[in-house]
Every structure is written in C-alpha cells, then in structure tokens.
Amino acid sequence: MQDHQFSYEVDAPVEDVWAVFWGRKTGDVIQLGKVRIEILHGGDDNGEGLIRHCHFPVPWYLLSGGKAKSWEWLTQVKKYESWRYDAVGKPLWSKATGWTRLDALDGGRTRVHFRETYHVFNPLMRFLLEKVVHNAISKDNDQKMKLGVERGLKARGRAATQPSHIRASGN
C-alpha cells in the first residue's frame, strides 16, 4: 500500500476554502488540465454522499491510451473541517482512500492537509506496478490541488496574496 500526504497554506479563511471544494451540484464538471471530474450526485447540503467520476492521465505502459478512471464517494463530511473519500480506479484496478482536513490559522489563513492511500488489488500487479503508478498519478497532486484552491479563491474574489508552502511526505 502506498501512502502520500502533504499540507499547504492559503491566504483565506476556512469558510472560503471550504466553498472552493464544496457546493457542487449533480451534473457539474470540473476540468483542470487533463483531469476531468464529473459530479454524478451532489450529496446532501454538506456534501455527504457526493459521488464523482474522475478521468486522469496514467503511464502509457498500462495500455489504456494513457487514460484512467475512478469512481469516488465522499463520507465523514464535517463542515468547515474535514472529509474522506473512497475510490475504485482502473485500468490498474485499485482502491484509494483520501482524507482532507482544514485548519484555521491566525490572520485569516488556512492550512489544508491531504492524505491518500493507494492499494492495487491484484498481488502481482501490486508488486510490479503499485509504487511506480501511484508515484506517476500523485506526482503533481500537491501543486495541482494548491493551484486549484488558489484559482477557486480568486474566482470567488478572494485571491491568495501571500506565498504559500507545501510539505509533502509519503511513499
């Protein structure tokens, strides 16, 4: 099993950062470069039960045309605080679990913590490919998530004006 975690800070209060992640409705589509996220079910008022279908690039040697899909559902949603997702992905049949937590900081800033575990079902494929594929899939997640939050804040009229930092660990 692979485990990747990182955190970063943004110049916005928790409520504004939460709003970037939440408030999606059934049928919404989020496109960030080669990553496409379709909201299949928006969940309840807090996002509990949200279901999304994700399309993202993977290494060519998986023989899928460089494309992968995952089906994800969100649970354990605590408004303005944290949530969890579970996912099943292919072509390398796998399970991922992710946790996101928001911490309010002084000065109206927020620290975002993210952790994901990744597990390939087939024992042979797990031995041969799990680590290298997870590294390929998650190599830019830190920057992409931070950039997505900052763009979302800017679109909401709350630009991140101070430098933010990313700490990553895992694998």
Locate each region found by the language model.
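Glycine-rich portal/gate segments that line the openings of hydrophobic small-molecule binding cavities
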Residues: 28, 38-91, 143, 147-170
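Short, surface-exposed coil-to-beta transition loops
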Residues: 3-5, 65-71, 94-99
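Beta-strand/loop substructures that line and gate deep hydrophobic ligand-binding cavities in soluble
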Residues: 86-143
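A short, structured loop/turn motif at beta-sheet edges
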Residues: 11-15, 44-48, 75-82, 101-113
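Beta-strand elements of well-folded, non-transmembrane domains
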Residues: 10-12, 56-60, 91, 118-122
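Hydrophobic ligand-binding cavity/cleft-lining segments
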Residues: 1-47, 170-171
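Ser/Thr- (and often Asn-) enriched beta-sheet segments in non-cytosolic proteins
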Residues: 5-9, 36-38, 53-55, 84, ...
